[in-house]
Design a protein with these regions (language model features):
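Extracellular structured ligand-interaction cores
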Residues: 3, 56-58, 96
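Flexible, active-site-adjacent loop/turn segments at secondary-structure boundaries
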Residues: 13, 27, 89-90
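Glycine/small-residue-rich interface belts in oligomeric ring/scaffold proteins
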Residues: 16-81
Length: 227
């Protein structure tokens, strides 16, 4: 198996957590559906092919730097005399992510080539969150192996974290571990779709020591939980 490692450092990022219409909260990392959707856009895939790509690629992410959390407030004008409801949007300014994708050689190589010469402009999240490479060689293909590890820097599966873990801080700008329901797939019914979620624990600025070694994929030696 081979993998694709993509290092990005956008000016801003927003990955909406869909639970409140007046608070546009954000995951502090690109969810699985967003990251694979970014590849699908770069590859110029229609919806049906995007659905197929979701089944062909595994995904993991390391939050190298969460960036600065920014709150943006706006009021939408409706009609004269109507009550005004301010809407708050959470953004992350200049975060730094390492995205990991694993799958069949043909699929991974096609995704890699698409990032170098995309059909559509890659976005990370909403339409204001443009994809910015973190460095010149921002995408690379690496060897991937199965393994077990207890020292992890990537987003962790919630079930493994709940068995026991401790967070070791390495940087001043950090995020303490917090559980999220990350969208990992979609169920389609007619013209509509519904997200499928998985419990994960995200953090930044350090690493997690799990109580027990867990199954991971090693991307050129880097242990990553893949969903």
């Amino acid at each position: 198996m081979i993998g694709l490692v993509v290092e990005v450092k956008p000016i801003q990022a927003h990955f909406r957590i869909p639970y409140n219409s007046l608070l546009l909260d954000s995951y502090p990392f690109p969810p699985r559906t967003t990251a694979i959707g970014m590849l699908a856009g770069a590859m110029g895939l229609p919806e049906e092919e995007f659905r197929k790509l979701l089944t062909e690629l595994g995904y993991g992410v390391i939050v190298e730097d969460p960036g600065a959390r920014v709150e943006e407030t706006a009021v939408i004008f409706k009609n004269p005399g109507s009550p005004l409801y301010p809407i708050k949007k959470i953004l992350y300014h200049r975060p730094h992510y390492r995205l990991f994708f694993a799958g069949r050689e043909e699929t991974v190589e096609r995704a890699y080539e698409a990032l170098l010469d995309p059909v559509f402009t890659p976005y990370l999240g909403d339409s204001e969150s443009l994809f910015y490479p973190a460095k010149r060689e921002y995408a690379r293909i690496v060897d991937v192996e199965e393994g077990e590890e207890s020292t992890i820097r990537s987003v962790v599966l919630g079930d493994e974290y709940s068995k026991g873990a401790r967070f070791m801080v390495l940087r001043r700008n950090n995020l303490t571990p917090r559980e999220y329901s990350m969208p990992v797939d979609f169920i389609y019914r007619g013209k509509g779709r519904r997200a499928v979620y998985k419990r994960v624990v995200a953090f930044a600025g350090g690493y997690v020591e799990l109580a027990n070694p867990a199954s991971v994929l090693l991307f050129d030696g880097e242990p990553v939980f893949v969903f």
